Swiss-Prot record:
Pfam families: JAB, MitMem_reg. It comes from Mycosarcoma maydis (Corn smut fungus). Residues 32-169 form the MPN domain. Keywords: Cytoplasm, Initiation factor, Protein biosynthesis. InterPro entries: eIF3f, EIF3F/CSN6-like_C, JAMM/MPN+_dom, MPN. Belongs to the eIF-3 subunit F family. It is found in: Cytoplasm. GO terms for cellular component: eukaryotic 43S preinitiation complex; eukaryotic 48S preinitiation complex; eukaryotic translation initiation factor 3 complex, eIF3e; eukaryotic translation initiation factor 3 complex, eIF3m. Component of the eukaryotic translation initiation factor 3 (eIF-3) complex, which is involved in protein synthesis of a specialized repertoire of mRNAs and, together with other initiation factors, stimulates binding of mRNA and methionyl-tRNAi to the 40S ribosome. The eIF-3 complex specifically targets and initiates translation of a subset of mRNAs involved in cell proliferation. This is Eukaryotic translation initiation factor 3 subunit F. One of its GO terms (molecular function) is translation initiation factor activity. Transmembrane segments: none annotated. GO terms for biological process: formation of cytoplasmic translation initiation complex; translational initiation.
Length: 301
């Protein structure tokens, strides 16, 4: 930590080389990517909180590179904040048991930090951050905050922010640290993007049938193809300057589609794929029915 010269009153903080737990870090985190699944899990935990509980916390799971962290999943962790005594209690045994269980399902996802459903950063946050810094050692722990207060007075609710901590003071203590904000963005796959678009739409309607959903998807594809054709024609005619990145992406996309096939061959391949899908659906229904019959027979015996 260093103070600026006389021409400025700003306080300059170097990204941490260590944390309050005494763990050395080789390189600071420069960005955080969050998947929607993790955010929905945090919201679900908040909605199921105990009466009178100000905020809930939990463990973040994901992957990391040298400079970035990708948050893919999370799980809740019971905790208690005692304002009178100025103490916070975290159920560490529950945290470690849940992590061992998650490792059996997804061994590639490790602890990357923790979340809280409150934008407030206080002494309790510093103490919890110190605990998770030990769990993620020798890497830095990320603290993700979610603002769940949607009262209409703010331009946008559910503000997502992420931080890393830096020790403060000549003698570092667990409760003395400063939180440094990190760039945070939403990372989603194509199926997740479709689901988010459906949730964000304001239209209230009955669930679509499979054929209706297919028709909507085909219309969206047709609309996207029209946009691509308009762009390509504008580039060819010289009305718009071409982008090499867009051109490479279009080339990779087109190369995936089988070319040089006549209509009969393409129809044969499509029908074969359709038969495979129907067979998988039929087998899934058979397994589901067998499981239900087995469970009912178990109850009778």
């Amino acid at each position: 930590m260093s103070l600026a010269g006389s021409s400025s009153s700003a306080l300059h903080l170097d990204f941490p080389a260590s944390t309050g737990s005494g763990v050395m870090h080789s390189r600071s985190v420069t960005g955080v990517h969050v998947h929607p699944v993790a955010l929905f899990s945090i919201l679900d935990h908040y909605l199921r909180r105990n009466d009178g509980q100000h905020r809930v916390i939990g463990t973040l799971l994901g992957t990391r590179t040298e400079s970035e962290i990708e948050i893919k999943n999370c799980f809740a962790v019971p905790h208690l904040e005692d304002a009178e005594e100025g103490q916070v209690q975290v159920d560490m045994e529950y945290h470690r048991s849940m992590y061992e269980l998650c490792q059996k399902v997804r061994p590639d996802e490790v602890i990357v930090g923790w979340y809280a459903t409150s934008p407030e950063l206080n002494t309790y946050s510093a103490l919890i951050q110190d605990f998770y810094s030990r769990e993620t050692a020798p890497h830095q722990a990320v603290h993700l905050t979610m603002d769940t207060t949607i009262d209409g007075s703010k331009p946008s609710g559910l503000g997502i922010k992420s931080y890393i901590s830096s020790p403060l003071g000549a003698t570092p203590k667990a409760e003395n640290c400063v939180f440094l904000p990190l760039p945070t963005n939403l990372l989603h796959s194509t199926p997740e993007h479709s689901s988010l678009s459906l949730l964000a739409s304001q239209n209230i309607s009955s669930p679509l049938t499979d054929l209706d959903a297919l028709a909507v998807s085909l219309k969206q594809v047709q609309s996207q193809l029209d946009r691509v054709l308009t762009y390509v024609r504008a580039v060819i005619s010289g009305e718009k300057e071409g982008d090499k990145a867009v051109g490479r992406f279009l080339n990779d996309t087109i190369s995936v589609v089988p070319a040089g096939l006549d209509d009969n061959k393409l129809e044969t391949l499509f029908n074969a794929h359709l038969q495979d899908v129907l067979m998988v659906s039929y087998l899934a229904n058979v397994v589901r029915a067998q499981a239900e019959v087995s469970s009912r027979l178990t109850l009778l015996t």
